Amino acid sequence: MGLLTFRDVAIEFSLEEWQCLDTAQRNLYKNVILENYRNLVFLGIAVSKQDLITCLEQEKEPLTVKRHEMVNEPPVMCSHFAQEFWPEQNIKDSFEKVTLRRYEKCGNDNFQLKGCKSVDECKLHKGGYNGLNQCLPTMQSKMFQCDKYVKVFNKFSHSDRHKIKHMENKPFKCKECGRSFCMLSHLTRHERNYTKVNFCKCEECEKAVNQSSKLTKHKRIYTCEKLYKCQECDRTFNQFSNLTEYKKDYAREKPYKCEECGKAFNQSSHLTTHKIIHTGEKPYKCEECGKAFNQFSNLTTHKKIHTGEQPYICEECGKAFTQSSTLTTHKRIHTGEKPYKCEECGKAFNRSSKLTEHKNIHTGEQPYKCEECGKAFNRSSNLTEHRKIHTEEKPYKCKECGKAFKHSSALTTHKRIHTGEKPYKCEECGKAFNRSSKLTEHKKLHTGKKPYKCEECGKAFIQSSKLTEHKKIHSGEIPYKCEECGKAFKHSSSLTTHKRIHTGEKPYKCEECGKAFSRSSKLTEHKIIHTGEKPYKCERCDKAFNQSANLTKHKKIHTGEKLQNWNV
């Protein structure tokens, strides 16, 4: 198909035809010619300024121009054509007059305008004027006009589509900018602009989306914002669609039941995945380290360890995580939120897994059993720790001092010795700790509560670990023995500290003078030398000391213990 030319869109009249038009019709003609010309120029189509254009711009009468060839067969034209598109009676009459004269001059005496009683009866109307479009000469085929604004089309379908633009009702609205359209196709085309631009960009991960609403949803990954709550179980979701899908679980039939534990599922694939828990099968293996998993999602999460990807960052302390759920749990350290409460004793936890394990205390159940020695535990974490007694495996090593640990959590806590980080702060007195357990124990000082009581002697303790240690006094148990010298200890921490005598290890270093110590308590006391603080005060004479050992020695002056020794 050749390029569009000005001749293709021009409407031409003979001199006689031109004289039949009144002033309004001639002005309309001029406007249409000029508009067509400007449209072609705008589209970049080369158009020479013909005499016709020049005359029109100067508002002169146009010269006689050649008319197009007429069709050989005389067409039949519906009179509703003129009535619909040229509603004004004088324009309709002129149209019919000019059309008939043109065909008569070409020798087509049989040309007639067919009269129809209604548009509905007219086959030409019903056919969308397809036949009319094909048989009309150039002049008539360009005469489909929009009566809202002066615009001429060469097909009825184009005119009809154009008229919709002037409809006041525009039901198709853009969610992004609020703009309305009368046709769905126009809205679809408009929305593609957003897809191309991708103007909504996430500041966290630089992901681009084509709608601001999508960006808002995406950001909830980082904020862990969960707006949609299930009325049945109080579970929350960050997208309404997720809540809707979750609600279906209540309504859905669950025909697939696990024969092992009785749990039911609404999909056979879910049951298949669940069964892996009982079989111990781990089909999803990490190519990097060989570790296997029973779920593909767990493997995906694990892979982030190797890539180092940690997209979920805590705004409070800057700590990063590989999973959004881990960040949600971590945030509870700062907020103190403990949503999981034991109905038996009222104790609350920040994790559902902790509550589940805690319940075993009340039931006496110990489901976690060591395959090596048969010892059972009420917590899986206790079993994991116990197993390392048999293996002596310590895979987590500190890069700072080389110390190795059985658990990653222990390494994390240990690192705070070097960094000095103390994220757990007491709201009562402002004292900070590097472990949450230490803060929990410390809080009991303010309440004065000592819930852990010795059945043997009645002595009460703030911490359960202190009671456990105390009981060894009555039992005489000293389970922790040094392999180097054979000395035994009641506590594992005492053995650890003792071992440093043999190794010479001094992990606690003073930043002020560089002096190192084997115990953190010694470093704490040493720091007082630099500050000049003397926190240890004698109750008898108000004399103060910078070390507790010096106060202990001083007290002997008042008790007479030192004098007695001198007399000997």
UniProtKB/Swiss-Prot annotation:
The keyword Cytoplasm does not apply. This is Zinc finger protein 675. It is found in: Nucleus. A zinc finger (C2H2-type) spans 144-166, 172-194, 200-222, 228-250, 256-278, 284-306, 312-334, 340-362, 368-390, 396-418, 424-446, 452-474, 480-502, 508-530, 536-558. The gene is ZNF675. Its main location: nucleus. May be involved in transcriptional regulation. May play a role during osteoclast differentiation by modulating TRAF6 signaling activity. It holds the Pfam family zf-C2H2. Residues 4-75 form the KRAB domain. One of its GO terms (cellular component) is perinuclear region of cytoplasm. It comes from the Eukaryota. InterPro entries: KRAB, KRAB_dom_sf, Znf_C2H2_sf, Znf_C2H2_type. Interacts with TRAF6. One of its GO terms (biological process) is negative regulation of transcription by RNA polymerase II. Keywords: DNA-binding, Metal-binding, Nucleus, Repeat, Transcription, Transcription regulation, Zinc, Zinc-finger. PROSITE patterns: KRAB (PS50805), ZINC_FINGER_C2H2_1 (PS00028), ZINC_FINGER_C2H2_2 (PS50157). GO terms for molecular function: DNA binding; DNA-binding transcription factor activity, RNA polymerase II-specific; RNA polymerase II cis-regulatory region sequence-specific DNA binding; ubiquitin protein ligase binding; zinc ion binding. Coiled coil: none annotated.
